[in-house]
Amino acid sequence: MNPLISAASVIAAGLAVGLSSIGPGVGQGTAAGQAVEGIARQPEAEGKIRGTLLLSLAFMEALTIYGLVVALALLFANPFV
């Protein structure tokens, strides 16, 4: 295996995980903050807000998992070799 391709694959895998974590991390922090504010304003709607928050957090986390899958594919099932 070409060492240049191996090195580029490792760097690309690191970038895939790192960059795919930035957006969902910021989004999850914003969503959680807004949910806390909403619950503070309307405590009786806590159950509905929490359910919606957990569902949206799961969708956001899926983006990070996609980045991890791409990184694992680059590391272990490298299509460029």
Swiss-Prot record:
Coiled-coil segments: none
Swiss-Prot/TrEMBL keywords: ATP synthesis, CF(0), Chloroplast, Hydrogen ion transport, Ion transport, Lipid-binding, Membrane, Plastid, Thylakoid, Transmembrane, Transmembrane helix, Transport
GO terms for MF: lipid binding; proton-transporting ATP synthase activity, rotational mechanism
A Pfam family: ATP-synt_C
GO cellular component: chloroplast thylakoid membrane; proton-transporting ATP synthase complex; proton-transporting two-sector ATPase complex, proton-transporting domain
Location in the cell: Plastid, Chloroplast thylakoid membrane
Topological category with respect to the lipid bilayer: Multi-pass membrane protein
InterPro entries: ATP_synth_csu_bac/chlpt, ATP_synth_F0_csu, ATP_synth_F0_csu_DDCD_BS, ATP_synth_F0_csu_sf, ATPase_proteolipid_c-like_dom, F/V-ATP_Csub_sf
Highest taxon listed in the record's lineage: Eukaryota
Functional summary from the UniProt entry: F(1)F(0) ATP synthase produces ATP from ADP in the presence of a proton or sodium gradient. F-type ATPases consist of two structural domains, F(1) containing the extramembraneous catalytic core and F(0) containing the membrane proton channel, linked together by a central stalk and a peripheral stalk. During catalysis, ATP synthesis in the catalytic domain of F(1) is coupled via a rotary mechanism of the central stalk subunits to proton translocation.
Subunit description: F-type ATPases have 2 components, F(1) - the catalytic core - and F(0) - the membrane proton channel. F(1) has five subunits: alpha(3), beta(3), gamma(1), delta(1), epsilon(1). F(0) has four main subunits: a(1), b(1), b'(1) and c(10-14). The alpha and beta chains form an alternating ring which encloses part of the gamma chain. F(1) is attached to F(0) by a central stalk formed by the gamma and epsilon chains, while a peripheral stalk is formed by the delta, b and b' chains.
Similarity section: Belongs to the ATPase C chain family.
Extra remark: In plastids the F-type ATPase is also known as CF(1)CF(0).
NCBIfam families: ATP_synt_c, PRK07354.1
Protein name (Swiss-Prot/TrEMBL): ATP synthase subunit c, chloroplastic
Species annotation: Chara vulgaris (Common stonewort)
Gene symbol of the encoding locus: atpH
